[in-house]
Amino acid sequence: MIHSIKDKKIRVIESKWNDGMQDRGYVYGQQKMISQFNCTGDWAFYIEGDEVYHENDLDQIKKSMEIYLNDSNVEALVFDFYHFYGNANSILDSPGWYRSEARIIKNSIRSYAPDGLFWLVLDSNKKGRYPRAKKTGISCYHYGWVRTEEQMNLKSSKVQKYWGGKPMTIDYSQMDQSIIKEFQGSHPLVVKDWRPKINE
């Protein structure tokens, strides 16, 4: 699919997953760092396969990078998150589902990823810290849970081993209903043709 885009800006890096690494998602961090080590330019923008950014926000994302490029007190840019759950009309609003996270980081600082979700900055060789970051006020649209229970349980059976645990049984009815809210915004155009299928 990626190769079919045929954009000279896109470079696919072939890599091998370490199936022996099954400790707290560290293999995701390994793959993330392979990509980061191959990035050029001033910033690295980390986007997972189930995350989308709205076309209306792209100019503001670029502007944020321009504003903070030469600010030594800013090492990363943080995005808010919409976590869609079960369908594209429902989102989860709870501290248990990370509400914001750094997704853009400067390429000029020493950083590493202990898993796929976040970065740590190394001021010394023995201790890491969260990057100094600015909020963009922009949201990331996370569609990873917009699947049927059957699809989610299949996914769990395949990926949970990388976290050192047994596959979780996904049952949407067990979610605390008080944290499920109706999504009131507009979806990115890139998911326009996909949404009817996931809302069935």
Q: What residues fall within each predicted segment?
A:
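Conserved catalytic core of Hanks-type protein kinase domains
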Residues: 38
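Short aromatic/hydrophobic "clamp" motif used to bind/position activated sugar donors
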Residues: 44
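Acidic donor-binding segment of Leloir-type glycosyltransferases
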Residues: 1-23
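Catalytic-site signature of metal-activated, phosphate-bearing donor transferases
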Residues: 25-29, 33, 52-200
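Active-site acidic Asp-centered loop
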Residues: 47-48
